[in-house]
Amino acid sequence: TWDAEGFLEVCPEMSGIMRGEGEETFCRLVTYYIEGEGSLSGIRGLTYRGEDGRIHETGDAELPDLDRIPFLYRDPEAFENRIVYYESSRGCPFRCSYCLSSVERRVRFRSMELVKKELNIFLEARVPQVKFVDRTFNLDHGRTEELWRWIAEHDNGVTNFHFEIGADLLTDRELEIISRMRPGLIELEIGVQSVNEDTFREIDRTMDLER
């Protein structure tokens, strides 16, 4: 939440809130409670209620290197016949006023080599669908083209891939790659919040409606 202190003030039953991306903060918090190491004041990314009843806030946690975040889908049987969610990037460069993602404008990526290696695990397990949760997958056109070509070349005839994209960002080369894919190999989800240009201006959303 963007207003962690405010939530603690109105919710006395809550003892604390993790802010931002939680991997590092959560690990340190678990270590603190289980092993008794350190103190809450030494864990970045926390807003918490102290023993004195006052609300304390530590500094923001550093953004993690996405390649260091563990891959959770190690056992193929655990996700057999399931939809799996996969994250190859974090962040958003846009500044839509209604979206918390606009606070952090930096976009970070998991390395392409690692992404392909992990997607291959899903392909070998023949999972029905891999759903990318990247906020706007086709921001980086070179990366988009490379991965879509790789997916087309490694199609197992079963698995399909779902992407959230900016339709107005699609290029002719990306469309050409899609045209040569097996029907249903990929799904594209397009968020069209409005078709009114005045609305876009009010919410600071960028979109080329003519495209």
Task: Write out the residue ranges for each language-model feature.
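A generic "binding-loop/recognition-motif" signal
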Residues: 22, 62, 92
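A generic structural signal for short, non-catalytic loop/turn and secondary-structure boundary residues
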Residues: 39-41, 62, 79, 156
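Radical SAM [4Fe-4S] cluster-binding motif and immediate context
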Residues: 67-211
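Glycine-rich beta-alpha loop elements in corrinoid/cobalamin-binding modules
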Residues: 1-59
